[in-house]
Amino acid sequence: MQTIDLRGVQPTRTAFERLVPRPVVDVQAAMTVAADLIADVRKRGAAALREQAERFDGGVPASVRVPVAEIVAAVDALPGGVREALEEAIARVREATAAQVPPAAVTRIGPGAVIEQRWQPVERAGLYVPGGKAVYPSSVVMNAVPAQVAGVASIALASPPQREFGGAVHPTILGAAGLLGIDEVYAMGGAGAIGALAWGVGELGLEPVQVITGPGNIYVAAAKRVVRGQTGIDSEAGTTEILVIADDTADPRYVAADLISQAEHDEAAASLLVTDSPAFVGRVAAELETLAASTRYAERVRAALGGQQSAVVLVDDLDAAAAFSNAYGPEHLELQTADAEAVLARIQNAGAIFVGPHAPVSLGDYLAGSNHVLPTGGQARFSPGLGAYSFLRPQQVIRYDREALRAVAGRIVALSGAEDLSAHGEAVTLRFEERA
């Protein structure tokens, strides 16, 4: 990993971003391809989805809409340990997510004047579960549970067909969907799948959804940008990121293992260690060398750790470490310091924060109860991770009686006149006119 020495330096956020550039992910460049694929699905429906499956996934599904019997069979075929782990993950995420649903609030502005704020779930959600270099049944859990907790009545799930399973959705994905009671699953992936969820495909019985969530590759991100406005989206997910703030009290083996755990996702994954201890850097480097050599995806891990997006950052103190992290806005932030709570108090921007030596990112990926669908690419500076709120809309309900309206009628007339919109004021005053 490259080393960046910021001791004695107070760079700006722009300088931070230049020092540790993120992977080059040009979503805009992929939008033309994504838009064309979506347009083809809107025009030709299931035929376009099958052609795209053969072209991009190497397998054509026997049925784009997965028969319910296959989902039931996939649940039955889940290995015992996997099923138990999924059931535990579902329970934990459900419990933690329940706290995200806000109660309705009623405000009495004055006599006879009431404003209620209520939270309404979208009617229908589309969940995208990626394929590619790994299989992600955990993403089924992380997308579906918040939608269910929010009260979404109808859920459709899309996942790419898998060549090794004859064009079918991976059976572990189907099993996870079945455990969650989802019986509307489609063997489709990429930009075409996002378009199908957004506009529907009548011949498949696929009705349009109001929100699409879930991570994917650059074309999925581009497709989300294309369909925004037709439907809501959660975010444009990029490659995974981990930033570890550690001092010399941390266990270098733990830190190295956590950096590697995210590097194994993709050659473009970002792994950063920010520390005030040069001696600790050497200990972590030795552990990285040992652990990376023994991992299943050693070549991928080495490529990620050696990429421009990964680095060891030396800083003067932990205040400077927190400042760097806030400027970077990591997807995953680990705090492994003698007083992690003190560092936490200085953190503003992160998708999720893992405090202490026994809260690795891997815990959050599967069984912490938190959600692992998190903002990447610096979006943690302004966007949250996935939650029940991703499927909820606040609505204001206004109730005024006659006297409450009369009390503000004059001011409404004054303001509407100032805006040269006299009919606004007249819509109020006519309510108090005598009618013959």
Swiss-Prot record:
Q: What superkingdom does the record give?
A: Bacteria
Listed binding positions for Zn(2+) are: 262, 265, 365, 424
List the active site. Answer: 331 (proton acceptor), 332 (proton acceptor)
Query: What is this enzyme's EC?
Result: 1.1.1.23
Identify the SUPFAM superfamilies for this entry: ALDH-like
Q: How is the cofactor bound?
A: Binds 1 zinc ion per subunit.
Key words, A-Z: Amino-acid biosynthesis, Histidine biosynthesis, Metal-binding, NAD, Oxidoreductase, Zinc
Q: Which reaction does it catalyse?
A: L-histidinol + 2 NAD(+) + H2O = L-histidine + 2 NADH + 3 H(+)
Question: In its UniProt entry, what is this protein called?
Answer: Histidinol dehydrogenase
